[in-house]
Every structure is written in structure tokens, then in C-alpha cells.
Amino acid sequence: NTLDSKCLQYGVEIHDRMQAEALIHDGERCMGAIVRSLRDGELVAYIAKATLIATGGYGRIYRATTNAIICDGGGQICALNTGVVPLGNMEAIQFHPTGSVPTDILMTEGCRGDGGTLLDVNEYRFMPDYEPEKAELASRDVVSRRMTEHMRKGFGVKSPYGDHLWLDIRHLGEHHITTKLREIYDICTHFLGVNPIHQLIPVRPTQHYSMGGVRTDKDGHAYGLKGLFAAGEAACWDLHGFNRLGGNSLAETVVSGRYIGSKMVEYLKGSESVFKTEPVNDARKLVAKTIDDIISCRNGKENCFDLRNAMQDIMMDDVGIFRNAKDLQNGVDRLLELSERAKHIGLHGSVKGFTPELS
């Protein structure tokens, strides 16, 4: 991809199939990370004067999300586990109105921007009833709430994957769909088995973006540890507030990458190159023990994938688009129950390299 090509162009060494497990620190300064090879499970200490967390968001804690499978909050967890680095605005989650069903692949806002409409189980266009002025062109959070509200009233389309609504772009015509919305046409035909020229597209509000993350100052420096930075969706840089505008994350990526990168260079020029060995050894031993303890649980009755799915359902049910004290407390109680059950996980394998059970 483009990023890999640029790295190769500038001679940046890429270590692929490596997963960060913990940050190395002494309570005041970050010295790198303990990383697990997904090939053979070897733990490697990456020593660094400056460390950047750029692992993306945490959308995979929800059942329905447009995020890639690796966006499970791993970077935020590494920061939180230090005990000194705070996270910020973790409750700030954006839902996109039109995630496809059942794949949750994003149906771009260009569909509605070009004139696409949202229909219910009766193929009735309902958005003008809720938002007379903007209808489908209201902001993402508004459209997502209205769609959810309409489905809760019983107007959703029943399916094995849960209720959904319809996105209709048929009236835009074949030429427009296959040229201006070519990506949507390809996604629908290849992944949904739907021809959007003649058929309706099943959609529902889907978790899309995380405004929260590792709390940083304006220069991307994480609070709590010197030498630790965060950027992009992994960070709480406070650029978006609690509701990102469409397209702004791309702008943030470009701007923060250049700006925070330059601030890291400034930090490197003024930082010492002497590292203590004790924090490195302690971090590696702790990660090794954690992995060994998990793998040794071969006789536990709980399945880690069942627990993950249950967590995702809780987040969708109680910490979704609509939030209130009752549902939030119910969600907390149910998550605490899962936490107790997680103490009795039983793994099927003992591989320390690539295994979804450890990831």
C-alpha cells in the first residue's frame, strides 16, 4: 500500500507481524515497548528514546463496526496498563448511519449526498418526518439516532443479523452508480450479493470512529510519561471534540503525522540515550508471565470468543447510540460479570505466536 511504499522509499525499516504487548517505563519515562512476534511468539524489547502509539481506534469492542479487525484498543490498553498514562473521552463514540448488513462495510455518505434515500420495512422514506429541512443530509449522529429510533418503533426490516433499514440509490441510474459510486457498486455486488442498480441496500447505524484515546497535549506528547507520544485515532488530541465531522480524520492524519513527528524529532534532540536495564527486564518478565498464565489455563470452561462476543453485544445494547443511567449501569454490571467469567477461560492451543486467542 501507499504507506509501505513511502517507508521503502525513505529507507524506513518495517517489522511486520509484530504486536506490542506493553510499554517499557520507570514511572516517569517511556523507553520503548515489549513486542511479541506473531510468527513464533518471541518477545522482543524495542528500546527507544521516543515511542509513538498510532494503533487506531477501539471500534472492535462493538459488535457492529466499520473498523478493521486490528482496531481493538490495543494501543490504548498498553498506555492504560502503565498506571500513569491517562485516557481521555473514551465514551466519545461516533456511529455512521449506513454500515452494510451483515458485513458492516461502510456505505459512503456520497450515496446520500448524491440523492440516496433511507426507507423502512414498508419502503417508506421516513427521514423527512424527523428532519424536515435536511432529511438524509442531517449530520451523522442525527441520522443514526433517527434510524435507531425508527427501528425501535417497529419499522425495521427483520433479518438473521438483526433489524436494518434500506438505502435506496436505484433512482440515481446505472451510469451514475457504476461511475460516481463505483466502489459502492463493487461492495454491494461482491460482498452483499446485491445489485444496487435494481435492489435496495441493507444498512444500519454502525460504530465508525473513536474520538477518545491516549490523552495528549497539543504536541502529541502523552501525559504521565516522557518520551511517549500518540497520534491519529489512537489519541485524544481534542481536535474533533465529541462528534467528528466527516472527512476530518483524514485531515487530522495528515496534519498530526507531520506536526507530531516534528515534535518527536525535537524531543529526541534533547533527550538522553542512557537506559536502565531493570524496567526492560521487568516489563519483559511481566508480559511473559501473563502469556504463560493464559496459556496454562487449558481446563477453563469459558471460551474467549464467546466472552468477546458477549462484550460486543453489551456495548451495542447499553453503551450505543442512546445512553441513559439505567442502561449504562446495566452495562457495567454485565461487564463485571464477564470479567469474573474471564478468570476461567480455557484455551484450545498453546502456541505463543499467531493465535486469535492471545490477540
Language-model features, listed with the residues they occupy:
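Glycine-rich loop(s) and the adjacent beta-strand/alpha-helix scaffold that form part
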Residues: 50-105, 137, 152, 159, ...
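Core beta-strand elements of the Rossmann-like FAD/NAD(P) dinucleotide-binding domain
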Residues: 40-50, 223-225
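A conserved beta-strand/loop element that lines the FAD pocket in flavoprotein oxidoreductases
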Residues: 8-20
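Glycine- and aromatic-enriched mobile tails/lids
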Residues: 119-128, 132-137, 156, 209-211, ...
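Short beta-strand to alpha-helix junction loop
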Residues: 1-5, 15, 65-73, 100-102, ...
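General beta-strand structural signal in soluble alpha/beta enzymes
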Residues: 14-17, 45-47, 53-54, 87-92, ...
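An anion/pyrophosphate-binding glycine-rich loop and adjacent beta-alpha core
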Residues: 78, 85-195, 199, 263-270, ...
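A short, glycine/Asx- and small/polar-enriched loop/turn
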Residues: 25-31
